[in-house]
Design a protein with these regions (language model features):
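Acidic/His-rich, divalent-metal-binding segments that scaffold phosphate/diphosphate chemistry
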Residues: 1-97
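Pre-Walker A (Motif I) flank of P-loop NTPase domains
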Residues: 240, 244-250, 308-310
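Glycine-rich phosphate-binding P-loop
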Residues: 248-268
Length: 389
């Protein structure tokens, strides 16, 4: 891993001093942070004012917590960075609705922004440790608002177990870290309901303590049972489920230049492959503009294989959950068991590999894909592998 993580860790306050929000504003992270000073919040819930002021209060609350300083160095740095960046998505998501300021889906938007910056500017991609630290920060940002709604949510156990399962793909992640971030977020608000919000957080996490998942994911009976539970097909997490699938379909995803074709030749030789790129080339369809016809034709090829119960590979970039969801639903509907393999490589390595291809993808297009990238989560398929190439 490059010195990218060291540069980020240097921003984190130490007991001896140094670092902090002002230092972060002068770093490459400042591009995400500075707009927050001009981003309003609803006064009923954020009497402190703009998002940057709220961020400063959240950091102060986190740094005042003894359990923050008890964390190991890497988790402490990642948690602080997640607190620093947890609301960067609000700059793009905030709007006035019915006379009140709201910021729907800002956690999801913020995670994408931060992932792209850490991937491209700090070199946290293409090797396991950098990826793990990057995704710990991004996972905390993505889900930082979820704990506030656990107590009133239907099926809170299922939501907690699904959140805890993030630790299967991001081993440094835990519900305890998410709870610490949510508590600091609540303490960083000036609002009449702050004490009540903190109480709801405590109550919302009680099932996690009972299930033993504050520090680690739940041990399901099988991957098939885990997926079925998250899909609502099993009532209790301890249940087992008979695997009635006829075989496996492999969904391969990742940015251009990550080596998907190379991985396939080495790891899945002989399997049929359905590739939107091949469909596009065969029919002379353009790589830019609407792709509905390309995806329709590729889906028809997949259906033909599914009807014959022939295992195959779906080989596409599939960079977002919404893109993958369409294919995953199709494969499951035909009774296949699905395995997702997500490949990633370093930014410069990926660009160089892409440039060496006969039909290179424009770099600007790859940058847009990176900005939309949502790596697969554990609940998307029976098996999810995340590999660096």
């Amino acid at each position: 891993m490059s010195g990218g993580w060291a540069a980020l860790a240097a921003l984190v306050p130490a007991p001896s001093g140094g670092g902090g929000l002002d230092a972060a504003l002068d770093s490459p992270l400042g591009a995400l942070l500075r707009p927050l000073g001009d981003t309003p919040q609803e006064p009923r819930w954020h009497g402190e004012g703009d998002v940057l002021t709220h961020t400063r209060l959240v950091l102060e609350a986190l740094e005042a917590a003894p359990e923050f300083w008890a964390l190991d160095v890497e988790r402490r740095a990642a948690l602080w960075l997640a607190a620093l960046l947890h609301d960067v998505g609000k700059a793009a998501c905030t709007r006035l609705e019915g006379g009140a300021w709201t910021s729907p889906h800002h956690g999801q938007a913020g995670a994408r922004l931060v992932r792209a910056l850490l991937w491209r500017e700090y070199g946290l991609a293409g090797e396991a440790r950098g990826r793990g630290l990057r995704e710990l920060v991004c996972t905390l940002i993505r889900h930082h608002a979820a704990p506030a709604h656990l107590f009133e949510a239907p099926h809170p156990e299922r939501r907690l177990l699904r959140l805890a399962a993030q630790g299967e793909l991001v081993p440094l992640f835990s519900l305890r870290l998410l709870k610490m971030l949510a508590e600091a977020d609540a303490r960083g608000r000036l609002a009449a309901d702050r004490a009540e919000a903190l109480l709801r957080l405590e109550l919302g996490f009680l099932p996690a303590e009972e299930l033993g998942i504050l520090e680690r994911p739940y041990a399901f009976a099988s991957p098939r049972a885990e997926l079925a539970y998250f899909e609502g097909k099993l009532a209790y997490p301890a249940q087992e489920l008979y695997d009635d699938s006829w075989g496996e379909v492999l969904l391969l995803c990742g940015l251009p230049g990550t080596g998907k074709d190379t991985w396939l030749r080495a790891n899945a030789p002989g399997l049929a492959v359905v590739s939107p790129d091949e469909v596009r080339a065969e029919y002379g369809l353009p790589p830019t503009g609407p792709q509905e016809e390309v995806m329709r034709l590729a889906a028809e090829r997949a259906k033909a294989l599914l009807r014959q119960r022939i295992p195959f590979v779906w080989n596409a970039t599939s960079v977002s959950q919404s893109l993958r969801a369409r294919q995953l639903e199709l494969f499951s509907r035909y009774g296949a068991r699905v395995r997702i393999v997500c490949l990633e490589t370093g930014w410069e390595t990926g660009l160089a590999r892409n440039a060496a291809r006969a039909e290179a993808v424009p770099e600007a297009a790859i940058e847009r894909m990176l900005e939309r990238l949502e790596p697969p989560e554990r609940w998307e398929a029976a098996r999810v592998d995340w590999l660096c190439t």
